[in-house]
UniProtKB/Swiss-Prot annotation:
It comes from Dictyostelium discoideum (Social amoeba). It holds the Pfam family EF-hand_7. SUPFAM superfamilies: EF-hand. One of its GO terms (cellular component) is extracellular matrix. Keywords: Calcium, Metal-binding, Repeat. Residues 9-44, 60-83, 92-127, 133-162 form the EF-hand domain. This is Calcium-binding protein G. Ca(2+) 2 binds at D140, D142, D144, Y146, E151.
Length: 169
């Protein structure tokens, strides 16, 4: 799933990819053009250009025909955008967890016990009498009765990814 913003970014990435590598401006990108582009960018170092072109070609040219279809380029750009979103969510989740543990982890064991978790539960705007045990069970993946830093990080990451998906276009 992607958002409207993701789609326009991916479209721009596709246009940039074609602009960067379509040397003869025929709106078609070939493995030869990829190699020539890298050769120019790497000041004539044919070994490095060959290696870089090989990696990119093996990643993008799914049918190994030496040509990059619009579908292949768009899939590559969409995959790159997805990886970036996931990396950003992971980094932000880590920062969220560190801030949360600094504030709520009174015994400094890098996990929240039930008392600490109920405080977190209240801060999130949940009614503490509704069912903190239910939410604890959802976040507590290993079911040890504590919410560890890694469990919190995964939970925050999934919430951020869900938010990043936003409305579907």
């Amino acid at each position: 799933m992607s958002t409207c913003g993701d789609n326009s970014k991916i479209f721009q990435d596709i246009q940039n990819f074609i602009q960067d590598y379509d040397l003869n401006k025929d709106y078609s990108v070939t493995s030869s053009e990829i190699y020539q582009s890298f050769l120019k960018k790497m000041n004539g170092d044919s070994l490095k250009a060959s290696q870089a072109a090989g990696v990119l070609c093996s990643t993008v040219d799914m049918d190994n025909d030496g040509k990059f279809s619009y579908y292949e380029i768009s899939k590559y750009c969409a995959d790159q955008a997805k990886k970036q979103i996931e990396q950003n969510a992971e980094t932000a989740a880590l920062a969220d967890v560190e801030a949360l543990l600094l504030r709520l982890d009174k015994d400094k064991d890098k996990k929240l016990n039930k008392t600490e978790f109920v405080k977190f539960f209240k801060e999130q705007g949940y009614n503490p009498y509704s069912d903190p045990d239910y939410v604890l069970k959802i976040i507590d993946l290993d079911k040890d009765g504590y919410v560890s830093a890694s469990e919190l990080q995964e939970w925050f990451k999934q919430k951020r990814l869900a938010y990043a998906r936003g409305p579907i276009c």
